[in-house]
């Protein structure tokens, strides 16, 4: 026994060259481990990586879609705001034009009413003046006849003669007023 130990110790095996049995066992273990990794672990990693890539790409696509929708909504909002401002300006201008038209109509109606009232007042004044002239002619005629009969000393009871005297007197009076007015 000592002899085997000594012969083993003296036997010249190279420590750098592995034992072929050890090498076979290690290679078989590596092959089994490699098969398990390739068959089960790598597909799980690939599946996880694919899901992550899909989630990231889907998130990017969703973000781009949301950005596009937000941009479209912003453009629609701006367009609606522009349309609303244009509509407000149009309504404001229509209101101004309508107000100006109403004001012009009211001024026209006021001018027509003023002209009507003025014409009515002139007509009323003229009718009152005519009534006053008729009344005054009658009174002046009576007074003139009475005064003339006192001055002349004779009675002017004849109506035709009295009417001529009154008419002549009034004509003289109108001539004096017309001359004084000029």
UniProtKB/Swiss-Prot annotation:
Primary location class: membrane
Compartment(s): Cell membrane
Source species, domain of life: Bacteria
Keywords associated with the record: ATP synthesis, Cell membrane, CF(0), Hydrogen ion transport, Ion transport, Membrane, Transmembrane, Transmembrane helix, Transport
Transmembrane segments: 25-45
Membrane topology, as annotated: Single-pass membrane protein
Pfam families: ATP-synt_B
GO molecular function: proton-transporting ATP synthase activity, rotational mechanism; proton-transporting ATPase activity, rotational mechanism
GO cellular component terms attached to this protein's record: plasma membrane; proton-transporting ATP synthase complex
Record note on quaternary structure: F-type ATPases have 2 components, F(1) - the catalytic core - and F(0) - the membrane proton channel. F(1) has five subunits: alpha(3), beta(3), gamma(1), delta(1), epsilon(1). F(0) has three main subunits: a(1), b(2) and c(10-14). The alpha and beta chains form an alternating ring which encloses part of the gamma chain. F(1) is attached to F(0) by a central stalk formed by the gamma and epsilon chains, while a peripheral stalk is formed by the delta and b chains.
Function: F(1)F(0) ATP synthase produces ATP from ADP in the presence of a proton or sodium gradient. F-type ATPases consist of two structural domains, F(1) containing the extramembraneous catalytic core and F(0) containing the membrane proton channel, linked together by a central stalk and a peripheral stalk. During catalysis, ATP synthesis in the catalytic domain of F(1) is coupled via a rotary mechanism of the central stalk subunits to proton translocation.
Family: Belongs to the ATPase B chain family.
Name of the protein in its database record: ATP synthase subunit b
Origin species: Arthrobacter sp. (strain FB24)
Gene name in the database record: atpF
